[in-house]
Design a protein with these regions (language model features):
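Short C-terminal tail/terminal secondary-structure segment
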Residues: 6-9, 60, 140, 151-164
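Active-site helix of classical SDR
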Residues: 35, 71, 79
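Catalytic Tyr-X3-Lys loop
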Residues: 13-32, 47, 51, 75, ...
Length: 164
């Protein structure tokens, strides 16, 4: 479950209900609906892996505006509760919390003079943005049998951002 959109870093008083609903529809409700659709089949097989894409914004403020940050917190809570509820039935549930990943979603950060992208890289302990392939490799590993004992964990891939 990896659908996600940003909210242009809007604080609460700049976030109308339509924006809030849109962020939650894409980031949270899509995850809920897809999981609800596929989970019965996984339970019937007593096997399955669900990987939800959260964000470091699900741990700390500052990775997005109020709607995005709230949605990413919701994803973490959903992931942990789902993991607890279905672990004994053979369902492995975990999440990934990316930090600064250079994707089309972050194109605006690189626009113009690119000061935002430069600032983010400088604030990240490893001093760079991650490539999407780095997140893909982590996702592939988490889907393997070798990662089957990882249950309910949210794995950060953030260049050390959460260390600060």
């Amino acid at each position: 479950n990896t659908a996600g959109i940003l909210d242009a870093y809007h604080p609460l008083l700049e976030t109308d209900e339509a924006l809030w609903d849109r962020i939650f529809a894409v980031n949270v409700k899509s995850m809920y609906r897809l999981t609800q659709l596929l989970l019965p089949e996984m339970l019937q097989r007593t096997s399955g892996t669900i990987i939800n894409m959260a964000s470091i914004a699900g741990y700390v403020a500052g990775g997005g505006g109020v709607a995005y940050t709230s949605a990413k917190h919701a994803i973490i809570g959903f992931t942990k509760q789902l993991a607890l509820d279905y672990a004994s039935q053979g369902i492995c549930v975990k999440g990934i919390a990316p930090g600064a990943i250079q994707t089309p979603m972050n194109t605006a950060d690189f626009a113009g003079d690119g000061k935002m992208a430069e600032w983010v890289a400088n604030e990240t302990p490893v001093k760079r943005w991650a490539k999407p392939e780095e997140v893909a490799e982590l996702t592939l590993f988490l889907a393997t049998p070798q990662a089957s004992y990882i249950q309910g964990a949210i794995v950060p891939i953030d260049g050390g951002w959460l260390l600060k």
